[in-house]
C-alpha cells in the first residue's frame, strides 16, 4: 500500500467506525482530473446505499479539512461486494480455503497473475495453492487481490 493510501486509511478509519462500519480498504486511482478515491466499508449486517451516502458525507468533511489530496478527485463509497478486494493479512486469513486472484508487482513462479486457494498466512506472507503447487507470496508484492465468488 502506498504512503498516501496508508495516511488516508489512518485518517478515515475513525470517522467510518463512528458510523458503526469497518473501513475494509481503499483505492486511490490517479488519473489527472479524473482521479478516484474509492472507499470500501463493511458491516456485519451488510451495507446499504444509505450507509454509503452517510459515510461519504462524513469522509468528505474530514477530507475537506485535512486536504490530503491536492489534485481534483471523485470520492466513491461502496460495500466490498462478493468478489471483494483484499487489503490486509487479516483479510486473507479470514478467507483461508477460498479462491483468490492476485496481481503481483514482481512475478512469482514466472507469473504476475495468480489464481489459487488461500492455504495460510504467515506474518506478511500469503500461502497459495495454484494448480497443485504451493506458492509463497509476500503481501507487499500484491498490487491487487480479490476473492473469487463461488456460485
UniProtKB/Swiss-Prot annotation:
One Gene Ontology biological process:
translation
Which UniProt key words apply to this protein?
Answer: Cytoplasm, Ribosome biogenesis
Q: Where are the transmembrane segments?
A: none
Cellular component GO terms, alphabetical: cytosol
Q: Is Cytoplasm one of the keywords UniProt gives this record?
A: yes
- Name where it's found: Cytoplasm
Claim: Protein biosynthesis is one of the keywords in the record: no
Which HAMAP family does the UniProt record give?
RimP
Q: Which family does it belong to?
A: Belongs to the RimP family.
Q: What does this protein do?
A: Required for maturation of 30S ribosomal subunits.
This chain belongs to the protein called Ribosome maturation factor RimP
Q: Which organism is it from?
A: Shewanella halifaxensis (strain HAW-EB4)
Question: What gene, per UniProt, encodes this protein?
Answer: rimP
Amino acid at each position: 500500500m502506498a504512503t498516501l493510501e496508508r495516511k488516508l486509511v489512518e485518517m478515515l478509519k475513525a470517522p467510518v467506525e463512528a458510523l458503526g462500519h469497518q473501513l475494509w480498504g481503499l483505492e486511490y486511482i490517479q488519473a489527472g482530473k479524473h482521479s478516484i478515491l474509492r472507499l470500501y466499508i463493511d458491516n456485519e449486517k451488510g451495507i446499504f446505499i444509505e450507509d454509503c451516502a452517510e459515510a461519504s458525507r462524513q469522509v468528505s468533511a474530514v477530507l475537506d479539512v485535512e486536504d490530503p489530496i491536492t489534485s481534483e478527485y471523485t470520492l466513491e463509497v461502496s460495500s466490498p461486494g462478493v468478489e471483494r478486494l483484499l487489503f490486509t493479512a487479516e483479510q486473507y486469513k479470514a478467507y483461508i480455503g477460498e479462491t483468490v486472484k492476485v496481481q503481483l508487482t514482481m512475478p512469482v513462479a514466472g507469473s504476475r497473475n495468480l489464481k489459487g486457494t488461500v492455504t495460510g498466512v504467515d506474518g506478511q506472507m500469503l500461502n497459495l495453492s495454484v494448480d497443485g503447487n504451493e506458492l509463497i507470496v509476500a503481501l507487499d508484492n500484491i498490487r491487487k487481490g480479490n476473492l473469487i465468488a463461488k456460485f
